[in-house]
Amino acid sequence: MINVTLPDGSKRELPDGASPLDLAADISKSLAKAAIIATVDGQDWDLKRPLDGDAQVAIITRKDDKALEVIRHDTAHILAQAVQDLFPGTQVTIGPAIEDGFYYDFARSEPFTPEDFEAIEKRMGEIVDADLPFEREVWDRNDAIAKFEEMGEAYKAELIRDLPEDETITIYRQGEWFDLCLGPHLPSTGKIGKAFKLMKVAGAYWRGDHRNAMLQRIYGTAWADDKQLKAHLHRIEEAEKRDHRKLGKQMELFHFQEEAQGQVFWHPNGWRLYRTVTSYMRRRLEAAGYVEIRTPQLMDRKFWEASGHWDKYRENMFISSIDQEEKVLAVKPMNCPCHVQVFNQGQKSYRDLPLRMAEFGSCHRYEPSGSLHGLMRVRGFVQDDAHIFCTSDQITAEVSDFCELLKSVYADFGFEEPRIKFSDRPEQRVGSDEVWDQAEASLKAAAEASGLDYEYNPGDGAFYGPKLDFVVKDAIGREWQTGTIQCDFNLPERLDASFIGDDSEKHRPVMLHRAILGSLERFLGVLIESYAGKLPFWLAPRQVVIATITSDADGYAEEVKAAMVKAGLHAETDLRNEKINYKVREHSVGKVPVIAVVGRKEAEDGTLALRFLGEGGKTQEILSLADAIARLSEDAKAPDLKRV
C-alpha cells in the first residue's frame, strides 16, 4: 500500500501502482473530474502517472494558479502538431509556456503569414476536439536520438545529446504526434479548451545565439476560459493605445535611432518631464538625509575585478581598450563600487553612520538588440541610485525609513501600495554562505520589523546580496518592478570599506543598495503608459498652450504667456492662421492638459477660455488672467511642495 499525505495534513491509503487520479477519485467524483495535474513531493506530476511510493500529494484543478502554465504548455504542443500537420518538413525545436502565453520555435524556409495563422488555429481546434490522450513514455537515449534523426528533427536530436548521460528521456505523445518533453500535461487535448489565440511571429536564433540558425517563433496566448482570453485581448488593445513609443512621438518627448541602439534622444518636452521628476526626487532625498555625489563613467578593469563585477557581470559590460596605455576600461553597469570609493576617502567613525549617498548615476549595460523596447529596455540609463552605509544595528531602521519614503513617492506619482518580493541567494554569487546567511537574516528581520507583507522569490537575489523588490501596478493592471533595496555584506569586504567603532577598532559597514524609481527611463515609460500620456498637471511638459482665434489676439496671447512663465508655468502660444478647433484637436492629441483660447473678446476683457484635456474640449471655463494663473500655479506644484 501507498501512504499519501494531503495538503491539509490528512492521510489516505492507496494500492501500489495508484496514480494521483485514483487519489482524486477516492476523495470525490467532482475532484477527479476537475483535476488536471498533481504535485508529488513538490514535483509536477501527470494525473495518470503511477506514484513511486509514499508521498505528499496535491491535486491541481483548473482554478489553481499553476493550471495556466500547464494549459499554455499543452497549447504549445498542439501548435507544434498543427504546424507539422499543415506544413510537412517543418522542424520543431522548443516551445515553453511564458508569461500570459506560450511560443514555439520552428525551422522552416518559408515565412509564416497571417493567413497561415487562421489555418493553424483551425487545425489546433480540431486537435482539441479530437480529445487525444497525452501519454508519457520513457525512451532509451540512443533510440530517441536515432528516431528524431530519422524524422529529420536535427534540433531535437541535438537537445537529447546535450542532456546529461543519466537524464531520463521522456516523450509525450498525443495521437500519432510526439515531442521530447519533461511534462507534465493534462489528461488529454480536449481538457485544454479553445481559449487560445496566436498573436505574432518573430525571428529567434536557435538557443538565443546569433551564431546559430534563425528560426521562426510563433507566439500565442492561452487561458482557462473565453472570459479570461477576452479580458487579456482587451488589455493588449489598451496597452497598444498607451504605447509610450507612440505617445512619445505625439507628445514630442524622445526618439531612438539605429546609430545609438538602446539609447534615448530626449527632446525639449521629454527632457522637461525628465528634469521635473529628478528635481522632485532630489528634494525628497535631501529631506530624507541623503547627500548627492557624482562618480566616473569609465573605470579600469582591475577595479571591476576587485568588486566581483568582472567575473559575474562581464557579459553585460561595455569594454574599451586603450592600446597606447595597454589598459582595459569598462563603462560602469552599476554605481555601487564607485560609491564605496567615495566612502573610503578619509577615516569614518560610527558617529558618521548611517551615511546615505545618492547619485543619479548614468549606467550602461549590454542588452541584445532584439530585446530592446523603447524606454522600457535600453542600454544607457540613469538610476535614482543610493547606498546607505550603516551598522548591523541600523539595518532595520534604515529599511523601514526607506520603505516609508518609497511608498510616499509612489503615491505622489499615482501608484497604489506596491507588491513586495523577497529574493535570496542566486546560483551565481560572491561571498561565503555564512555571509549570505547573515545578510538574508538581517534583511528578513528588517522587513518583518517594518511590518512588510512580502512574498518569497527564491534564487533571484543580486550576485552580492539578498533584496526586496517593489512592484507597482499601472492603470490597466500591468505590474512593473521598479524599486529595490539590497543588503550587502560582500562589497564592503571586497573593497576594504571600514569605520572606527565605539570600541576604537575597525569594522566593516553594511551596505544597503536602494532605488525607488529604478531606471528613470523605464519609470517614465511606465508613467506615460499608465496615464495614457495625460500626465498630472505638475508633470506635464507642456502645461498650457494659449491658442488664438484671430490675429487680433496675438499681442494679448504673448502677454498671457509672459505672465504664466513668470508665475513658473510652462506656457506656449499658438498664433498660426488655423481654425481654433484644429488647434484644440492638435494639442489634445499632444496631451496638453490646458488650452487657453483667446480671441478679441478675451483680449478686451482680460480673460481666458480654458479647455481641459479629458473633457473633449466641449466645455470651457472663463476666468480672469489673474484667477487662471492662481489656479494653475497651485495645480503645477509638485505633491511634496503642496505639503510644505
Swiss-Prot record:
It is an enzyme of class 6 (ligase). It comes from the Bacteria. Gene3D superfamilies: 3.10.20.30, 3.30.54.20, Anticodon-binding domain, Bira Bifunctional Protein, Domain 2, Threonyl-trna Synthetase, Chain A, domain 2. SUPFAM superfamilies: Class II aaRS ABD-related, Class II aaRS and biotin synthetases, TGS-like, ThrRS/AlaRS common domain. It catalyses: tRNA(Thr) + L-threonine + ATP = L-threonyl-tRNA(Thr) + AMP + diphosphate + H(+). Its cofactor is Zn(2+). One of its GO terms (molecular function) is ATP binding. Its EC number is 6.1.1.3. Residues 243-536 are annotated as: Catalytic. Residues 1-61 form the TGS domain. Its main location: cytoplasm. It is found in: Cytoplasm. Zn(2+) binds at residues 336, 387, 513. Binds 1 zinc ion per subunit. Belongs to the class-II aminoacyl-tRNA synthetase family. PANTHER family: THREONINE--TRNA LIGASE, CHLOROPLASTIC_MITOCHONDRIAL 2, THREONINE-TRNA LIGASE. Catalyzes the attachment of threonine to tRNA(Thr) in a two-step reaction: L-threonine is first activated by ATP to form Thr-AMP and then transferred to the acceptor end of tRNA(Thr). Also edits incorrectly charged L-seryl-tRNA(Thr). Homodimer. This is Threonine--tRNA ligase. It comes from Maricaulis maris (strain MCS10). The gene is thrS.
